[in-house]
Amino acid sequence: MARAWQHPFLNVFRHFRVDEWKRSAKQGDVAVVTDKTLKGAVYRIRGSVSAANYIQLPKSSTQSLGLTGRYLYVLFRPLPSKHFVIHLDVSSKDNQVIRVSFSNLFKEFKSTATWLQFPLVLEARTPQRDLVGLAPSGARWTCLQLDLQDVLLVYLNRCYGHLKSIRLCASLLVRNLYTSDLCFEPAISGAQWAKLPVTPMPREMAFPVPKGESWHDRYIHVRFPSESLKVPSKPIEKSCSPPEAVLLGPGPQPLPCPVASSKPVRFSVSPVVQTPSPTASGRAALAPRPFPEVSLSQERSDASNADGPGFHSLEPWAQLEASDIHTAAAGTHVLTHESAEVPVARTGSCEGFLPDPVLRLKGVIGFGGHGTRQALWTPDGAAVVYPCHAVIVVLLVDTGEQRFFLGHTDKVSALALDGSSSLLASAQARAPSVMRLWDFQTGRCLCLFRSPMHVVCSLSFSDSGALLCGVGKDHHGRTMVVAWGTGQVGLGGEVVVLAKAHTDFDVQAFRVTFFDETRMASCGQGSVRLWRLRGGVLRSCPVDLGEHHALQFTDLAFKQARDGCPEPSAAMLFVCSRSGHILEIDCQRMVVRHARRLLPTRTPGGPHPQKQTFSSGPGIAISSLSVSPAMCAVGSEDGFLRLWPLDFSSVLLEAEHEGPVSSVCVSPDGLRVLSATSSGHLGFLDTLSRVYHMLARSHTAPVLALAMEQRRGQLATVSQDRTVRIWDLATLQQLYDFTSSEDAPCAVTFHPTRPTFFCGFSSGAVRSFSLEAAEVLVEHTCHRGAVTGLTATPDGRLLFSSCSQGSLAQYSCADPQWHVLRVAADMVCPDAPASPSALAVSRDGRLLAFVGPSRCTVTVMGSASLDELLRVDIGTLDLASSRLDSAMAVCFGPAALGHLLVSTSSNRVVVLDAVSGRIIRELPGVHPEPCPSLTLSEDARFLLIAAGRTIKVWDYATQASPGPQVYIGHSEPVQAVAFSPDQQQVLSAGDAVFLWDVLAPTESDQSFPGAPPACKTGPGAGPLEDAASRASELPRQQVPKPCQASPPRLGVCARPPEGGDGARDTRNSGAPRTTYLASCKAFTPARVSCSPHSAKGTCPPPASGGWLRLKAVVGYSGNGRANMVWRPDTGFFAYTCGRLVVVEDLHSGAQQHWSGHSAEISTLALSHSAQVLASASGRSSTTAHCQIRVWDVSGGLCQHLIFPHSTTVLALAFSPDDRLLVTLGDHDGRTLALWGTATYDLVSSTRLPEPVHGVAFNPWDAGELTCVGQGTVTFWLLQQRGADISLQVRREPVPEAVGAGELTSLCYGAPPLLYCGTSSGQVCVWDTRAGRCFLSWEADDGGIGLLLFSGSRLVSGSSTGRLRLWAVGAVSELRCKGSGASSVFMEHELVLDGAVVSASFDDSVDMGVVGTTAGTLWFVSWAEGTSTRLISGHRSKVNEVVFSPGESHCATCSEDGSVRVWALASMELVIQFQVLNQSCLCLAWSPPCCGRPEQQRLAAGYGDGSLRIFSVSRTAMELKMHPHPVALTTVAFSTDGQTVLSGDKDGLVAVSHPCTGTTFRVLSDHQGAPISTICVTCKECEDLGVEGTDLWLAASGDQRVSVWASDWLRNHCELVDWLSFPMPATTETQGHLPPSLAAFCPWDGALLMYVGPGVYKEVIIYNLCQKQVVEKIPLPFFAMSLSLSPGTHLLAVGFAECMLRLVDCAMGTAQDFAGHDNAVHLCRFTPSARLLFTAARNEILVWEVPGL
């Protein structure tokens, strides 16, 4: 394959500078002329004798071009009536040089072992004798495309290595030469390329074609070898006009004939050489099958054509030496050796879909493979190099970062690194052994060669890297030592064998000495030998071992003198043995100077054996040693790493390992000692801190299955080594290890919501393990055979397992003590092997699929009932095949598609409709062996398949995909593949676990293949369907029984909310790093408390027929940035509240609500024409990228939906001409993207080197924009060339004299000025033309988060809440005259209630609207010096909403300590009571019977235990009392308003007089659990048998409800009933219990309704008269809030999943509503039941109940 610098193609003439004639040669008549056809310069070579007139590359025959591209493209034209010759010298893999010649001089094909001669005829006349001869008079320019790999493979049975030289001989014109690994099609246009799976010729290589003409009418394309199958024994006869180019194949051998095509070809693909069967006469017997056949026939089965063209088949596998496939590296290719089974991707398949590559190897979990002795320090001691099966890993020990060397297709058996970290040598284990030399710094493979040894066991570099020695076995099993010269490899040369030697002595270790590169040492059974390379001969001499001659030596190491003396006399050799001996050998005298033996001796009571250095008896088996100038590190089979002084007087340090130590290596600085164990552990001991650091752990046998847990980012693997291991995906470190000595684990899966995983074993047992306690929780043994499949539903309520005996088990996992529900025999195919894809659950949890009851059938069942819904006979799918097909693995696609994918034994993946069983499409030729695992991404874009030792990725979304991308790296078959929960990574497991990054961004407007058209929504819905919603969870067709199918829902959410599993990126949810930066830099999303099931199954219905309609939104997202826009000229005013864009008429107060975002909106931008509004939200759990919605302002419809960044969008801005939209990612994403507003396609994107806090277009020049960040201003210049836009960057640092710190805001002033705000409160002024800061002044004490300029005035807003107006008209003059802050003065100042985050002003900056972090929007008038509240909301969580008796007002309380009274009609703030430094936790409004309206009062409970009474009419606090020692949780008035009941978090209920402030009764019945609800009503039911005027209840967090009858005027209180509900052991609501809520039924005084964290998610209806539960209403989740409508039989329930459910208790139906961005913790009907208030954190939504 072509090296990276030769990819995708190489211009040979340009690279070797032919015009200079320094690296090339010319002879005879060679000149540069201008060709009229090509309209450019070409080289003319002419002369009567071809051999005397030529161009040769390279100049000298002793040099080599070293071009490894598979295809050579020769662009030439023969001179009329002349002969021409083209000679190519090609080197094979075994370094044999073969000349390949093409000429019209040759009359027939000739072949020798070193020369191939092909006749090339460019005109065909009728007589055969005229076929060979002179070029025609009208010879045309020709593209000669030679497949050098096929030429050598077919005709000489050799494997192509590289192109060594080229000679172009007279007479011809030549334009250029190119090499490439890609098969280009020269005559394909752009339109044809879009429809055909071919790669067009690059523009640089293409011939010019005038408009309206055909390429084939002007030029000739010759492809050799061709796709032709048969070649006649005589020359081909053609009579064609215009002339054809014909390459004549060999006469006597009917091998494939080269074909030249000068007519359009319907399907032009890569050349395919097909070797006919050996039985055919005249076939080349020695030619192996070079390439498998590729069929691009248009014939398709009816099933494949049902829904569009099928996938093009991939060719079968073959035993190849070279193949063009993807590796794990980003876009690189590798040359695999001949014994590797690797897929031969059809040329062009690498270009099949973009990005290419779509996967990039990020991390590897594993160590060793062939052995665990290969682990090295880099010379600088910063990294460790070790093999992980076929991958070489370089691990930075301080950061844990990995990089990889990829290309080996079998386990790496030996490694060596030179002393300068320049060259890395590696060898792979499978015979015959292939070796590679790598550039260690770049990771590029410099050389690949076959070792003379059959198996390489050890490698050693000289310190300079010029000599490499290897030890191994030849094919007879004899020990062999080889020395290679590697000095010329880095200069383009090759590895040279310097010497070879066979020896009968055993060699276990071999080292080149550091003091002399010609000397080496080896040790083995009974021998220690010193070697020398001299005169091309390796000779060795034994060391006299004396009495130690029978020892089994295992390792050796040289000790360098402390003074660094390089003399041999200064070096000593240490050798260790399996008997515990360590010999110190003088290399100069070749004698043993000291012999020591390490023996274990046990002291009384000692925990470990002590060591003594010399004695008799059994010693400690030493496997490895390493020596530094000060100490010797010894690794032994008893699991200890010991550090000794060089005199071995005593142990300095020791570290015990979990297994025998197999290798030790002291770092170059001597401070760290690397150790590896045979149990797969790799780590190092820090000698200074005496701390052992684990670097890598590994399974010691192939991994069978894996599973991922989303919340903690953990991975579980099971292996043939009988262990179950839990890994941290972020660090790739092992967290837990569960081992079973008798029972082998087979399958594993995580519980979706709890810290638990399930594992199936070979005995048939299924066990659950706790990740918190690291122990087995429950075990079930309902299977008789080994467990073959294990999977759970997405909600975690059900678990399924299958076994090798064919049984299927269903478990209930609603509680930790999970139990068996059903066991069905003979369901699953009994002889199916264990596979991660043996069982599959649909992503909505409703369907279960598996292979069974026979191999030929796939069964689909209802997951809850196990009712059989579908059975598909796979064996009857392919009627054209005589072989009975069988199913191997199954997986479901996204719920929206309804696809079920089945891999079969006939190398296909069949896509079925999961409901009807209809064949939707088919992917043929996936892999010749069974596929054990396959999975489809959440957005249905990529299909991942385990294909032998490779991973294949298909573009599933494209019906006519040309083929997959193939990735190597595994040395054993891949057992499992899976996408990570966020879809941004892929895991593959086999010999090791590989973690791959998915490089493809989420496509914004991509729809599911075959997905049904979107349902039309209500008035608030736009024409664009939410791609993110379709990419994850689609609305359920049914809600849980007994509710009917959910009718269409209201327009509060114009699209299905993308809550998905509710996981959110909360990295920015904490407090900002510094106070002033909170309002200056980034959008900080509100703390999200949504559960992982957020909005799953909700569907936004239209307004018609809905039960609720969103009327108003109370609040403003003060944590956004620039999330308010106002245009005074049009009156357009919009701001954000949670996920909603609120468009409000400032005159009437009427609101429109634009919905569809799946997360909280961070920022807004209005186009300069005021016709388009862009809104951006953060990333939700269902979308890997954030959303930007583009709205039509006039219609309120979403016109475009794009997904620009993987993190939150920090800023948006339209260009002055509204042709571009710039988006800026936050400090994690740091991406700047430009979008064309015509189609909103991505125009340009760049990764920023550091966090940026703001971006703005130059209003005077649409081609310039500016970013500000950490101490720099970045100017971007936009250069447009056609449709492409490139960015030129210029960075200017902030002058040190300014001392501004971080730049946090910016705005353009009068040309050419730019104003920048800083985190320290300064404003800097820049000259954008000169790129310098010429003025700064201190504008505030806090960070400047906002700047606006118009005319000659500048507005600044800071984190201190100050809004200041500056006169800056004189600043332009200061640019030339010099700076002076005295020329800038402040005109006005206003202090607002929070940090300024958004602002819009009119052109004169006289009035504007300003938003603050307090959730307030202010109208500011500079002329009047006033600020007026426009929008006011709570800045923190709203705890309660209550209503006045006449329903004219409502009141809210919040954790910010405020009680606010609102006018209900306009939702304008009327009164606010504020208590500093306290949280107001509960609130109650006095009932209507307490007196006249002017005597209405509010009772508010606070966190300090106080209860305050406020007078609404007098707007004053009347009374403060302290009835509780701890925080109040709920408060209520009695029906007459003369008594207040309050509950606290300790479970006490206090009864107080609001007039006197006395507490006259305290009830402690609920003590120990917080009181969550107190509900008071008039006692209407006389059947209760108790006295009293009031009936009230108290509910506490321990699932208990007490019901009381009271008459407080008589001081009477009597218990009516006591209810206790079962308490679950754990909960599904984020680790804390949902509240226990109860309320009296307003339409039936005898009924009580209760919700809480019970065993089941339901509403319990209890009859107080009958003393029993009369009804239960199921819920999808645990309730967080509850409210009953006084006027109708409606029940409102809020959930932590950001969802609201309205239940009609009379009809038994329900509707779900979305719109909140957080848990709906509060819902309250107004007394008239006409309105419903819901609250999520600090946002309040007001809903109208139509029909009342």
Swiss-Prot record:
Q: Which GO terms describe its biological process?
A: centriole elongation; cilium assembly
- WD repeat ranges are 407-450, 452-494, 501-541, 615-654, 656-695, 698-737, 740-779, 782-821, 882-922, 926-964, 969-1009, 1156-1201, 1204-1245, 1247-1286, 1298-1326, 1327-1376, 1433-1472, 1475-1520, 1523-1562, 1568-1614, 1715-1748
Query: Region annotation Disordered: residue ranges?
Result: 274-308, 1004-1071
- What are the protein's GO molecular function terms? microtubule binding
Phosphoserine PTM positions read 241
- Give the record's keywords alphabetically: Cilium biogenesis/degradation, Cytoplasm, Cytoskeleton, Microtubule, Phosphoprotein, Repeat, WD repeat
- GO CC annotations on file: centriolar satellite; centriole; centrosome; ciliary basal body; cytoplasm; microtubule; plasma membrane
Q: Which family does it belong to?
A: Belongs to the WD repeat WDR90/POC16 family.
Q: What is this protein called?
A: WD repeat-containing protein 90
